[in-house]
């Protein structure tokens, strides 16, 4: 029988045929050697495989090998051998579901169900999405693969594509009906798994993914994004529902970020992160920072800056955020003590500077006390940012917000003008501009934004 092994190993087809005619069994085995059919498949020799099958080799023999001949043919990526085995009734329940595009074409041709699942309830599409095999993903979808099938862990093909940061595959799945709001067994949306990549986050949000859904641990995509995401990604995930959302341990995004980059910490503070929230152990973000043996001074400064500024709105904020209870620690670090003094001086200066004569002060602007700030955007050039090194970001942020609001309001006025004129309602059109402006100021900005987007979409159609 060894002669058959040597003939196969040296790809001597004539010798193989002669030995089989002389009565050597095509499935003969010798301990420590592959079966003849398996060895031929590993050599990717189509002729040898064909000869053995024609002479009675069993295409489903797995007595010694841990996988079937069909599985091995798929693994070595030989469509021709796969087709041969299927022609000889290879068992289609004995092969892996991660297959290449050429193999998929063969399997589909032989009538294999593209929605078949393995013991982990994963389908062909799960594996193709996980491995960013775009051609296979497209082929499977064209042949009826279920884009929303979930495996034993509740993961959909979109979850797999997103977790591997394969944006193109994710986009193809979304274009073909993949649901962005599908949850796995841990309550995670695809957005939770893709929260560290700007392109993926933007793609999922563009396709309607909610950003405020919590997983079983109470974490939003923003909680996931904090550690490894860029500032631009964080901005996509922040809104009034997520900025102070608490996980099951009462950690806000600010608790997560305190040991990370100061730039992202400041961004959360600008957008309304609450520095008074306590975690399950009763610690505010400042408490945690002050308890660390190695102090992250820039982050402590950022929270102190916010505390002294917002104290103008909430008088007992220093106590609530943990500043008073940590005063001794802060006072013993000269850099922090000096920062406290600088904050107080700068806030006093902000009280003295107005946007225009007898108008709101810069402090009013920074503490959101001015509802009609967008009316003052033309006076923004009066601000000398160099005079406010600590709070210049707060001032710029509020002014940019006001400019955005003014733009939205003006677009909405034009939109409403257009709607009313089309319907021959001249009453709105005849209203003074200031009165129209005043009315729209009280409309929810997010509602206006969605209204404008909807109108733009209809116009494109």
Curated annotation (Swiss-Prot):
Record bears the keyword Disulfide bond: no
Superkingdom, taxonomy of origin: Viruses
UniProt xrefs under InterPro entries: Ankyrin_rpt, Ankyrin_rpt-contain_sf, PRANC_domain
Pfam family for this entry, one: Ank_2
ANK repeat start and end residues: 1-28, 31-61, 65-94, 96-116, 120-149, 153-182, 186-213, 217-248, 250-277, 281-312, 358-385, 431-460
Keywords of the record: ANK repeat, Repeat
PANTHER family xrefs: ANKYRIN REPEAT AND PROTEIN KINASE DOMAIN-CONTAINING PROTEIN (PTHR24198), ANKYRIN REPEAT-CONTAINING PROTEIN-RELATED (PTHR24198:SF165)
The name this protein goes by in its record: Putative ankyrin repeat protein FPV218
């Amino acid at each position: 029988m060894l002669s058959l092994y040597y003939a196969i190993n040296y790809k001597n087809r004539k010798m193989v045929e002669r030995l089989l005619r002389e009565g050597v069994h095509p499935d003969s085995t010798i301990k420590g050697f592959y079966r003849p059919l398996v060895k031929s498949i590993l050599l990717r020799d189509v002729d040898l495989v064909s000869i053995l099958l024609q002479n009675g080799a069993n295409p489903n023999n797995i007595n010694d090998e841990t996988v079937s001949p069909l599985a091995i043919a798929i693994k070595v990526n030989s469509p021709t051998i796969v087709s041969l085995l299927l022609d000889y009734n290879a068992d289609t329940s004995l092969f892996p579901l991660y297959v290449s595009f050429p193999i998929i074409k063969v399997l589909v041709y032989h009538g294999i169900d593209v929605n078949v699942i393995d013991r982990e309830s994963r389908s062909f599409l799960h594996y193709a999405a996980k491995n960013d095999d775009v051609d296979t993903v497209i082929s499977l979808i064209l042949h009826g693969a279920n884009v929303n099938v979930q495996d034993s862990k509740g993961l959909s093909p979109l979850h797999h594509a997103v977790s591997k940061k394969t944006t193109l595959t994710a986009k193809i799945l979304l274009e073909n009906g993949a649901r962005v709001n599908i949850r796995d067994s841990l309550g995670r949306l695809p957005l939770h798994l893709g929260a560290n990549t700007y392109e993926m986050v933007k793609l999922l949000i563009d396709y309607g993914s909610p950003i405020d859904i919590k997983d079983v641990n109470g974490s939003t995509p923003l909680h996931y994004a904090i550690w490894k995401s860029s500032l631009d990604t964080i901005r996509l995930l922040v809104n009034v529902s997520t900025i102070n959302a608490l996980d099951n341990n009462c950690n806000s995004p600010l608790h997560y970020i305190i040991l990370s980059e100061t730039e992202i910490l400041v961004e959360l503070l600008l957008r309304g992160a609450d520095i008074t929230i306590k975690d399950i152990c009763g610690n505010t973000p400042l408490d945690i920072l002050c308890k660390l043996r190695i102090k992250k001074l820039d982050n402590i400064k950022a929270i102190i800056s916010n505390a002294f500024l917002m104290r103008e709105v909430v008088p007992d904020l220093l106590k609530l955020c943990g500043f008073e209870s940590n005063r001794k620690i802060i006072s013993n670090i000269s850099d922090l003590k000096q920062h406290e003094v600088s904050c107080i001086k700068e806030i006093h200066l902000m009280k003295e500077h107005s946007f225009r004569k007898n108008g709101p002060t810069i402090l009013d602007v920074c503490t959101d006390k001015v509802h009609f700030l967008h009316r003052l955007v033309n006076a923004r050039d009066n601000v000398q940012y160099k005079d406010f090194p600590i709070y210049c970001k707060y001032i710029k942020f509020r002014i940019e917000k006001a400019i955005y609001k003014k733009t939205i309001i003006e677009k909405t006025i034009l939109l409403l003008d257009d709607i009313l004129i089309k319907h021959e309602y001249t009453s709105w059109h005849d209203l003074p501009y200031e009165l129209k402006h005043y009315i729209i100021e009280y409309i929810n900005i997010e509602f206006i934004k969605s209204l404008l987007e909807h109108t733009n979409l209809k116009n494109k159609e």
